[in-house]
């Protein structure tokens, strides 16, 4: 019977990563963030264990969206005369969160992984005490 060696100390370490979304495309950023949240970039990745990192995203309002496909959100669903508003101009952080959530793997971890994601529209964030690592080379 084969037994997999699992180093317990490596699974408990969670790094804080900082990603600047200024002048970056939505899909490219979402792929990088989903890989960081699930921990697939680590050498000791295992799908049964939670080995992902915390991710802080800044400048979400300055992302580049696909302008050819306007995205709308229904404000009052199921009623005649419902209001449609463009999601791109109103809620850039919500659009990023939806894209990342769709790229996460299916299963019970899909609900817990977005809890480690912090999205801010401006350049300021309250997580300076965690010393996040700025990731520019992955994007």
Curated annotation (Swiss-Prot):
It is found in: Plastid, Chloroplast. Pfam families: Ribosomal_L13. Keywords: Chloroplast, Plastid, Ribonucleoprotein, Ribosomal protein. One of its GO terms (molecular function) is structural constituent of ribosome. GO terms for cellular component: chloroplast; mitochondrial large ribosomal subunit. One of its GO terms (biological process) is translation. Gene3D superfamilies: Ribosomal protein L13. The keyword Plastid applies. Part of the 50S ribosomal subunit. Belongs to the universal ribosomal protein uL13 family. HAMAP family: Ribosomal_uL13 (MF_01366). This is Large ribosomal subunit protein uL13c. It comes from Trieres chinensis. The gene is rpl13.
